[in-house]
């Protein structure tokens, strides 16, 4: 992948946009579904021609669904939101079949973070969500993608094509080795419990991951 001076402005704009998208999705996973959180995500999705969040409204029921999806393991709506748990799991005849966790997925995610200077423990949000957050959680990995794209955008603005390239190359590697290999499966698992805000978030994120990977591959091939 080569980024010359004429391409820096385009790189900055594209990466800034992707950083914003990933950030909005991660924040929706880490916070109580307030009207602001929902509106932010809907605005981002709408800008991409996606209206799947247009009908979602904040409510006590939706807030309870947030708890059930992430923290109440006995709930029928609860699923695992970490790569190590989803990696070998599957949906069979409408039921989720969990396999044993794969610790190496978590370890590799941490190695990627350390390479880029990203600390998932500094993510902010609802107290329980951030205090129980694992390094290979969906929100952690999406936030990392936001971080990498932001780094690429900042480097492009600063006129540093080498740093921009390094951030985008690592972003592509993370997508290829991590998110692209489990985001769609997570979305399928989330849908088992029905079409709710969180199933739509998972599906939207999987679409974003696929789009981003396609664009990064095209950029690298130039």
Question: Where is each model-derived feature located?
Answer:
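Surface/interface-facing alpha-helical segments and adjacent flexible terminal/loop regions used
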Residues: 1-222
């Amino acid at each position: 992948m080569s980024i010359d001076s004429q391409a820096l402005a385009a790189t900055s704009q594209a990466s800034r946009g992707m950083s914003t998208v990933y950030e909005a999705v991660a924040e929706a996973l880490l916070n109580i579904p307030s009207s602001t959180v929902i509106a932010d995500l809907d605005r981002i999705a709408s800008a991409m021609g996606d209206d799947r969040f247009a009908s979602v409204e904040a409510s006590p029921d939706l807030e309870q669904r947030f708890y059930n999806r992430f923290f109440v393991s006995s709930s029928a709506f609860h699923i695992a939101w970490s790569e190590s748990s989803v990696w070998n799991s599957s949906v069979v005849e409408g039921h989720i079949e969990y396999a044993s966790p794969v610790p190496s997925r978590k370890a590799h995610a941490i190695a990627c973070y350390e390479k880029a200077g990203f600390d998932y423990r500094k993510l902010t949000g609802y107290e329980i969500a951030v205090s129980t957050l694992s390094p290979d959680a969906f929100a952690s990995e999406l936030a990392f993608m936001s971080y990498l794209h932001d780094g690429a955008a900042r480097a492009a603005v600063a006129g540093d094509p080498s740093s921009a390239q390094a951030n985008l190359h690592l972003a592509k590697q993370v997508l290829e080795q991590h998110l692209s290999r489990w985001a769609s499966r997570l979305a399928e698992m989330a849908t088992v419990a029905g079409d709710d805000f969180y199933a739509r978030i998972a599906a939207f994120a999987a679409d974003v991951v696929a789009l981003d990977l396609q664009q990064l591959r095209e950029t690298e091939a130039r």
